[in-house]
Structures are given as C-alpha cells and as structure tokens.
Amino acid sequence: MAAARHSTLDFMLGAKADGETILKGLQSIFQEQGMAESVHTWQDHGYLATYTNKNGSFANLRIYPHGLVLLDLQSYDGDAQGKEEIDSILNKVEERMKELSQDSTGRVKRLPPIVRGGAIDRYWPTADGRLVEYDIDEVVYDEDSPYQNIKILHSKQFGNILILSGDVNLAESDLAYTRAIMGSGKEDYTGKDVLILGGGDGGILCEIVKLKPKMVTMVEIDQMVIDGCKKYMRKTCGDVLDNLKGDCYQVLIEDCIPVLKRYAKEGREFDYVINDLTAVPISTSPEEDSTWEFLRLILDLSMKVLKQDGKYFTQGNCVNLTEALSLYEEQLGRLYCPVEFSKEIVCVPSYLELWVFYTVWKKAKP
C-alpha cells in the first residue's frame, strides 16, 4: 500500500532573512531534480516557492522576513528512489543554507518524516494532545464491535497494544497500570469480594485471581474486546478469559449500569470496586457532558455497593490535565455520601506520559 512520506526542515536565522538571496541560492537544488518552480511573493510577508516533480513529489519552500525558513517535501513512501532523492534534497538544502546564512543560522530542526496513509497507523496522540509515533510493525487485530473500534497493534518495545476507538488502553508492557489501579501492592485481596467495571483486557482480573480473593465479578459490555484480548493479549490476561467462570471469578457480559443498580437494590456490597471503564474527560464541552454524567452515575452507584470500609480504585488522566483532574475531584465532593480520596502518579510505559490514579473511600461515620 503506497503512502505519503512528509519530510520537514526548519531554519531559524540569527538575523532577518534576505528572501531573494535564499530563494536564488536554493533554486538550483530543485532544478537539478527536474522540478518545476512556481513562486509567490508578498511585500511584507516573504516568499513561497513550490517545486513539483513528474513523479508526483513536491516541495514547498516558505521564507518569512523575520528569519524563519521552512521546507516541506512530500513523496510516495513506497518509492525507494524517491526517498533517496528527498534525503538528498534535504542534505543539500541544509548545507547550502549554512553557506547562504554565513553561519548566522540560529537553529536548524530536521524532524523524522511523517508517513501518512500507510497500511499501519503508527501515530497516536497523548491525552494532552501531543503527537507520538509508536514503533508499530503489525496490525494484529482490527474489528468494529457494536460499541467501538478495537485494534491490537504490535509494538517492538511494548508488545501488543490494545487501542479502543483511537485511545491507547493497555499494552503487554503495562503491568504498572494494572498494579496502580489495584492499589499498588498495598491491599490484601485474600478472601475479599471484588467488583471490576470494564477491564475487558483481563489484566486486572488475572492479577487479582492470583491473590486468592473470595470472589471477583467483572462486568464488561463488549464481548469482542474479550475475544480479541484472550487471543492476542495473553501476556496480560493469561488464561482467565478462556472461560467466563472460574473457581473465584465470574465475567458478566453486560452494561455495568443495570448491574450496579441491581446490586444496590439487593443490598450487595464489595470490599473493592475497581473502575476500569474510561479516563476522566479532558474538558467540560457539550460533547463531554454525557461522559461526565456517566462518571457521576458510576461513582454514586459504586459508593452504594461499596462496604463502609471498602475502597474504590480508578484511573484519572494525564498528569498535565490539571483542570480536568480538578473537575473530577469536585465531583467526588458531590456524591450522595461523603468520601475522601488520595491519588498516585504512575509511569505507564506505553502511554508515554505520567498517569494519575485515584483511591476513594467513604468517610468514617461519626
């Protein structure tokens, strides 16, 4: 599958740019490649030169008067000869700019090329909006369920990564996530009743079952997540997803809201409730309102099925999203019962950003 390879080269000159001199100095590099030239000029805004090749590759050279010079080149990623030509152009432009600027170049920045439209999507944003290129080399699983798109991609560093509707959820390398959302090794699960909301990758269930609980109930709405993970995420889930019932656990393929309401009505209580459903929304925009309402409902229902001395564990979001985390903490003060909370910041390998986890418990009755 042919893809577009987008390369960039930036110069920040130490003085104002003589656009005409730079343009004339670089023209021969593109002409040597047989590229046709089109130049636009603005009296106070510099130059834009566009160079096109017969093979479809092209380059944009933008020269700003204040000293910023930008070069963008695009070619077919599958064209080995075209790649060599682009690399040659970049090298020659960098050398020529050093000559033209007479060593007044304050900064040169050459980023790795971005490959767009490839068979394997290697680019995923962090929660706070930064672009990350993963070392993805294989699409292991890609299916649409009635609820979401499910991808499992293989990373050379992180192993298989579960991605749900564009959000990086968990990689085989991410035991740190599972440990954090279970209390970071500080809890004794022996003989305890545990409720997991979500958790379709099986990581939490797999780790808790090892700790000899009385019973673990996991409520996951999406059977296809379980099916994909039990086949391709076995380093995370082991064999616990092979059967929906075991000696000390059961997996319910249901929406957790009706289940929580049913348990609350029955008066059923748990020592631990672990919410692995979704991260804290990043804003209070109208598009996010339904997610905030969902989180508030989950919190209230979870407190109703949590024992007085029990604990509720959940993820927050990226540590940089301070406003979103503060809004979540405000919600904790609006529950039907008074609660206290603590938080922990953990490095989850595949997230490539620090992540916040919460522990919530009911205030002691006077």
UniProtKB/Swiss-Prot annotation:
Catalytic activity: S-adenosyl 3-(methylsulfanyl)propylamine + spermidine = spermine + S-methyl-5'-thioadenosine + H(+)
Residue sites binding S-adenosyl 3-(methylsulfanyl)propylamine per the record: 148, 220, 255-256
Keywords assigned by UniProt, alphabetized: Acetylation, Intellectual disability, Phosphoprotein, Polyamine biosynthesis, Transferase
GO MF annotations in UniProt: spermine synthase activity
Impact upon substituting residue 276 to N: 200,000-fold decrease in catalytic efficiency
SUPFAM superfamilies found in the cross-reference section: S-adenosyl-L-methionine-dependent methyltransferases (SSF53335)
Segments crossing the lipid bilayer: none
Name of the protein in question: Spermine synthase
